[in-house]
């Protein structure tokens, strides 16, 4: 069973997947930084500085009178839709950035493939060429 496990791990697909997961984890940090540190401040400046909806909520009981979500949750049940809106906006920005990166990578790959000129087909060996000529002559006689 140990040998089977070694063979499974040594296959290229498993190693490629492991590398992809590790790079994906590192890439997530980069994209999160782009969203939090570059995109969100610009959006906040355009919208007047307030782009954090995390304190938007609806109280579900009369006991809830707190102005912040954390305090309101301590007082009773709340419908915290603001956090969801913030996460949804962050996700949309993240998805857009990833889309743009994938599109750029695909464009680069396509240009690299276009630069590679297809190699001309090698001429057939002499015996194949002679057999083709014989075949063509026999077709003409028939």
From Swiss-Prot:
GO molecular function: mechanosensitive monoatomic ion channel activity
One cellular-component annotation, GO: plasma membrane
Keywords: Cell inner membrane, Cell membrane, Ion channel, Ion transport, Membrane, Transmembrane, Transmembrane helix, Transport
Keyword Cell membrane attributed: yes
Gene3D superfamilies registered for this protein in UniProt: Large-conductance mechanosensitive channel, MscL, domain 1
Primary localization class, coarse: membrane
UniProt topology in membrane: Multi-pass membrane protein
Transmembrane segment boundaries: 14-34, 38-58, 82-102
Subunit: Homopentamer.
NCBIfam families given in the database record: mscL, PRK00567.1-4, PRK13952.1
Role according to the record: Channel that opens in response to stretch forces in the membrane lipid bilayer. May participate in the regulation of osmotic pressure changes within the cell.
Protein's UniProt name: Large-conductance mechanosensitive channel
Species this chain originates from: Sinorhizobium fredii (strain NBRC 101917 / NGR234)
């Amino acid at each position: 069973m140990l040998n089977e496990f070694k063979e499974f791990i040594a296959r290229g697909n498993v190693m490629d997947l492991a590398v992809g997961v590790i790079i994906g984890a590192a890439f997530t940090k980069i994209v999160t930084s782009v969203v939090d540190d570059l995109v969100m401040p610009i959006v906040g400046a355009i919208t007047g500085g307030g782009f954090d909806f995390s304190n938007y909520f609806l109280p579900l009981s009369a006991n809830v009178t707190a102005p912040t979500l954390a305090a309101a949750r301590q007082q009773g049940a709340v419908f915290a839709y603001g956090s969801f809106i913030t996460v949804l906006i962050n996700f949309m920005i993240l998805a857009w950035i990833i889309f743009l990166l994938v599109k750029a990578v695909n464009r680069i790959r396509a240009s690299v493939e276009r630069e590679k000129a297809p190699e001309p087909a090698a001429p057939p060996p002499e015996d194949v060429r002679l057999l083709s000529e014989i075949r063509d002559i026999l077709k003409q006689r028939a």
